[in-house]
Design a protein with these regions (language model features):
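N-terminal maturation segment of proteins
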Residues: 1, 5-263, 270
């Protein structure tokens, strides 16, 4: 119906009564800052430009002869960048984590007591799930924290993003930050379990950036993967404010995303 079509087209918060003010409130809530939508948008644009320049530099240093689009197409399509089995993919994540563990005391004075593991997302849920997620453990219940990796559709799980993803989800990323919060002594459970997206995901991004100091990103493809994850965050600053505050259409947002990010279409539309 035309009514349903109109609802589908109106996806921005700014389309609602007092929508722009509500969006400003949500921006403050999620970022824990006083940044205005225009400032967030401009920050995103500046970060996109910085990261794109670093990506171009990596491509040049890799010796690849071709354009940016040709390089990203090479990364997306060449069989060398993909595991052949689910077991190979999971083992790859676990190997990265084992390499990261001995580097952690060099960077952190306190590490969580909570153990962690890496397991696959259950097959019944994998098709509709994202690439990975973290689920915290419980000392009380004797449950470890887990980095859940998606092994569905192996041709969409490139090896060049595995180092950044592992550092983000496991150690020194979500597992370290969330577990330490839970282990704070004499702290109210609300504080131990309270989660602010800007901080939690910001910590994950920070953890990715520590990879160079920890001995990762030594090949140009993994370095490009790390920059791809940075670009993903920067692009979303632009797209989110663009759609919800500056009147961008859904197609404009998707097109901007696709210009700069190398993920598959399913992740882009999400």
């Amino acid at each position: 119906s035309s009514a349903a079509s109109d609802v589908y087209k109106r996806q921005a918060l700014s389309d609602n009564p007092d929508g722009k003010e509500w969006y400003k409130h949500r921006a403050r809530q999620f970022t824990t800052t006083q940044l205005q939508p225009k400032e967030i948008h401009d920050l995103g644009l500046n970060e996109v430009a910085r990261i794109k320049a670093e990506m171009d530099d990596v491509i040049t240093k890799s010796g690849f002869e071709g354009s940016f689009d040709e390089f990203t197409n090479f990364l997306r399509t060449d069989p060398q960048f993909y595991a052949k089995t689910e077991e190979e993919l999971l083992s790859g994540y676990r190997d990265i984590a084992k390499k990261a563990d001995p580097e952690l005391p060099k960077l952190f004075g306190k590490l969580p007591r909570m153990p962690y593991g890496i397991i696959e997302i259950p097959s019944y849920a994998a098709k509709s799930q994202t690439t990975a997620y973290y689920r915290g453990g419980s000392q009380k219940d004797g449950r470890a924290g887990y980095f859940y990796a998606n092994t569905y559709a192996l041709n969409t799980r490139p090896k060049w993003e595995m180092e950044a993803l592992t550092l983000h989800e496991a150690m020194p990323g979500h597992h370290l930050q969330i577990s330490l919060a839970k282990e704070l002594p004499e702290t109210h459970p609300l504080i131990q379990n309270l989660s602010y997206t800007g901080f939690v995901e910001g910590w994950g991004l920070y953890a990715e950036s520590l990879g160079t100091e920890m001995g990762f990103y030594k090949d140009p493809y993994s370095k490009f993967g790390q920059l791809t994850y940075e670009m993903w965050r920067a692009v979303r600053l632009v797209v989110d404010t663009g759609m919800h505050y500056f009147g961008w259409s859904r197609d404009e947002a998707i097109n901007y995303f696709c210009l700069l990010y190398t993920s598959d279409a399913a992740d882009e539309h999400s």
